[in-house]
Swiss-Prot record:
Function in brief: May play a role in photosystem I and II biogenesis.
Descriptive protein name: Protein PsbN
Membrane topology classification: Single-pass membrane protein
UniProt key word Acetylation: no
One cellular component term from this protein's GO annotations in UniProt: chloroplast thylakoid membrane
Family listed: Belongs to the PsbN family.
The entry's keywords: Chloroplast, Membrane, Plastid, Thylakoid, Transmembrane, Transmembrane helix
One GO BP: photosynthesis
Residues annotated as transmembrane: 5-27
Subcellular location per the Swiss-Prot or TrEMBL entry: Plastid, Chloroplast thylakoid membrane
Length: 43
């Protein structure tokens, strides 16, 4: 394979894995530990 192809595949896999981790953090098990600043400061 050419170097450009390997770099493109690496960058694509990195972006997909980062997006998956961000979605897991936002909506998965760790989301229960996130605080909601709007809920803390009710008017």
């Amino acid at each position: 394979m050419e170097t450009a192809t390997l770099v493109a595949i690496f960058i694509s896999c990195s972006l997909v894995s980062f997006t998956g981790y961000a979605l897991y953090t936002a909506f998965g098990q760790p989301s229960k530990e996130l605080r909601d600043p709007f809920e803390e400061h009710e008017d």
